Amino acid sequence: MGEKNNSKPNLGYGFYKAAAVTFPIALGDVFENAKRIVKHIKRAAEENIQLLVFPELCLTGYTCGDMFLRKEFYEQAEYALRDIKAATNGNTVLVCIGMPVEDHGKLFNCAVYLQSGSIKGVVPKTYVPNYGEFYEKRWFVSSTCRTAETIKLLGCTVPFSEKLLLKGENDVVIATEICEDLWVDSPPSGLLSRAGATLIVNPSASNDVIGKRDYRRNLVKMQSGRCRAGYVYASSGAGESSTDLVFSGHCMVAENGKILAESKDIMEDEAMVVGVIDIERCVNDRRKYNSDVWVNVPDIVESQIFVSGFPHVLPDYVEPYPFVPKNAAERKNRCAEILNLQARGLMQRIRATGIENVVIGISGGLDSTLALLVCCLAFDKLGLPREQIHTITMPGFGTTKKTKSLADELMEHLDTTYKSVDIKAACEQHMKDIGHAFDVYDITYENIQARERTQILFDYANMINGLVIGTGDLSELALGWCTYNGDHMSNYAVNVGVPKTLVKYLVDAYADIYADDIGTRSTKGVLKDIVDLPISPELLPTDENGEMVQKTEESIGKYDLHDFFLYHYLRNGFGREKILALAAIAFPNVEVSEIEKTLDTFYWRFRTQQFKRSCIPDGVKIGSVALSPRGDLRLPSDLMKMY
């Protein structure tokens, strides 16, 4: 049943631990600044940080003014660099510091990379600002003024280019842009990422004015997303001159459009912001979203780095519910948006067909409830009466009084046209016709009921000229947890893009957002009761007390886990071993053996049930994970192994 890969597992997982540092600058005192930098290098080594980024011109201070015109000043900075270089001996932390570097009579504002006692490369700033409060052109020239791709620093000839790529193992490729480079219309990181950079470093000295922090955060977030890369941003703070400006020491670590870690809003004298960047995810996204026109980036300069401790890096926290926003306000807004997407899809189908009746089977469970609420929302927006929503309960051998009662209440309170059709007699007759024993509770026993219900819905829809609305969700479709040509089939499937872990929040949100449209307080109570029910298809007989016996998660494992697996398998393209490692962090209270067993189930069912997905009805996509064979997922139904 398991889909384990027999090859040796990759224990690297593609994570890279990076930190951005701000510290109190001793303005103009290069040796004191070197001391403070060394202190952070030692700390980074102790904390197994692989990349440590300091602010722009941190060795001297950014606001030294005409001191940058003094040859002795930048010569002393180079001399102080010796202490920093020595501090990188005996560890493998890749260190990026900002300092002035002179070459052929020109002064460049540079990022200098050091690792294991050697200088790996020097990157000069390209866009040198000279407006408002910035006068950098008074002292520095652009990278376009360099005359060679190497430079002498501390007696060594090292790479010197704004197009420097620092290359390591496991797809770690580091490029650099410095402060203003990010703020222009075409940041260097865009081109460098197309040349292969997977992580962008930005040593910065960005002063603060009202609103600038939010703008800066958005720049970093969006650029990391546009480049599909990690982004480490470190800005100067305390110690810079306050003659005219204030620097807050804004530090961020971002990945692929998301801020992983950030310094506090209040100004901190000292901060080390640490984030674990998923390089593999960035590379997988580039492979998937490959609409970029390939261009040859000329004059790329490469330098090799050692990616230290890569196999041992894992994040401390992993979000267990990737489909569900943690923040309550954000979650409510997201749910409102999803409900509208679902409703809009159905509205278009109604307009296009001219069919203004819908038929939906109501079980009293979450999925059919959500589908019904979407129908109500669509009909309200179209100005159609809810009486044209035809809701049918079809009690069978496993239907409980509780779910039947909730279904009846819901249909009545939502002003739909409702009726009940008991399927037990029809199913018994069918079992008799095909020679199936009444007391053998196998897959045939279950599917007979599911297909009987589907037959009723389609025949009734023919009778009233209506559309059958599908209720199955994204998670069920991924696992094939539906009866082929039973609940698998409909005229339009409104829940097909919604993962199971999100369904209850959508029902809950409808109850809150559209409370006035629902009618009575009791309807809201019914919805809350439905949210609390265990998940079950109710296809097996109830116990002697009429209680539910069949519970889906006891058969296939927790949907919390399945949705986690689904997200990371499809959205991020991760392999089995990495998904297992992340799940163990995300669900610390679940035994690893249970996680592994459920993951085996996921892999097996996802592969073997593709034949159901190959012929699914139309339904709207609502998120980045979708399973339509006409869109996001193209797989053969007879795949022998899944990776």
Label each region the model flagged.
Residues 16-17, 33, 170, 227-229, ...:
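ATP/NTP-dependent adenylation/nucleotidyl-transfer catalytic domains that generate, transfer
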Residues 1-361, 372-373, 377-388, 418:
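Enzyme catalytic cores with a strong preference for nitrogen-chemistry domains
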